[in-house]
UniProtKB/Swiss-Prot annotation:
It comes from Halobacterium salinarum (strain ATCC 700922 / JCM 11081 / NRC-1). PANTHER family: EUKARYOTIC TRANSLATION INITIATION FACTOR 5B (PTHR43381:SF4), TRANSLATION INITIATION FACTOR IF-2-RELATED (PTHR43381). Function in general translation initiation by promoting the binding of the formylmethionine-tRNA to ribosomes. Seems to function along with eIF-2. GO terms for biological process: translational initiation. This is Probable translation initiation factor IF-2. Residues 206-208 are annotated as: G5.
Amino acid sequence: MPDADTTDDPGDLRTPIVAVLGHVDHGKTSLLDKIRGSAVIEGEAGAITQHIGATAVPLDTVSEVAGSLVDPTEFDLPGLLFIDTPGHHSFSTLRSRGGALADIAILVVDVNDGFQPQTEEAIRILKDTGTPFVVAANKIDTTPGWNPNPDAPVQGTYDDQSDRVRSDLDDALYELIGEMSDAGFSSDLYWRVQNFQKNVGVIPVSAETGEGVPDLLTVLMGLAQRYMKSEMEVTIDGPGAGTVLEVKDEQGFGTTVDVILYDGTIRSGDTVVVGAQPEPIVTDVRALLKPGDLAEMRTEKRFGNVDRMQAAAGLKVAAPDLDDAMAGAPIRVVGDRDVADVVTEVEAELAEVAVETGEEGIVVKADTLGSLEALVSALEEAEIPVMSAEVGDVAPRDVAMATTVDSEKHRVLLGFNVDVLPAAAENAERESVRVFNSDVIYQLVEDYEAFVDAQEREQKEAVFDNIVRPARFRILKDHVFRQNDPAVVGVEVVSGTLKRNTPVGGIEGNDLDRAGIVKGIQDQGEDVDEARAGNRVSVSIDGPTVGRDIKEGDELWVDLPEKHAKVLDQELTSDLPADEREALKSYLDIMRKRDPFWGK
């Protein structure tokens, strides 16, 4: 079998790893498709990438596409290796030893749509991981009146457009630059950027016509060559180090792992350690599979066997016992080291992304270690406790775990980029466990917070329905409709909420002298459950006789049970209207003159 290197003469410089990310339908796959010249997208449902993959684009191909913009003799780096994150997923933090897997990223933004939820999430994660990036402002060809110039550098094709078209595109581009500023990044059109370490370059492109693609490749190669060359220095012949992109069954090979190799060499027959749950897997490489340089790992139906692979490269590793391998986990070649030492190294790297969990909280599942870390970090920021956090689909045991919590608001499962197994969905419905599943981390956080808010609101409403509310009301002059059995009088509610079936009385000194119970309330002849401050209503009061126990002009209070007063004062004050808070405070002041600890 042949050897497979990513370049003819890589020396000690590896290929820079480029992540392509952006909101669904903004053209990530189309852009990569244009770069590699294959028709990947035409074979995919809904024009959305279905699986993660990687594409190696050698320097000579970059030079071909970029034309006069790139002089290959000026570059030492062997080319570019693109990771294609799935179109229906947001960018997750694929990690390498000590940081983000990608050396540089392309953030693809539809110039007409601007920032969308997944764009904003990608920006947050790029900022958190410190990954340098450029913005590909895609779909410039959809500007009304655009005159396409296929595969041309963007400045030339821009100059060829009419004044109106240029003006419309300028407006869209500067709106995008404004959104970048709002996100905390200084950016400008790439040819105006003097220092790419301080400013993000915006490159207008069309994945459809290829316009601007030469500029994009030129900028990527230039940035990598100028700012990252030292980071590309690797020990080519050293033991391989990589990150698992995806774990999947492959006909004829069993469970395999798709890997981005970012350091060293991996050979067929090597002993490797792969991050897994509950502990790392130690296994021997049975086969190394690699498509050609310009092929896409996701779409090649057949792979060629190779003896070895050198960084940086995308490859498929076939080996026994890979069933429990985790996407996003490290893979290490043992080489001449002690296996136990490498297992310890992998465990240490897994520990770096291990998440803090407690005895009480929600259950979290995510597709990769990196995205699990990002999700739990977002939950911690929102002060949402996590009881369990693992990589993998939502399974029945996850639902069972969610049922063990004490609080209803923690009886919840959050899934990021994962499937909910049918049995798990059935169990969740039966056990009243809420499951939220999304491909946007911050959407999950917002969904959960909205769920908790709604639950707390329902609980408070239930409490309010069953609690005696404070109120003060005055019997109106000339509004006695019946003297007793029951007394029916017109009243004005001064403050608070007067409800049916509420005991009421007058204040005598520092005590309340109960007069009776409000049995009914009518507003303009219609029965109502309550009356608020400012309302004038007629009430029927069971117990007193007008003229003897109560009189016109008297001010009556709701007789608050002490337990109810305590709940209102200590737990619900902020939910009461201002006038009702005033009524409660006045009532407590009166009661505490007699007993300072009343309602405490």
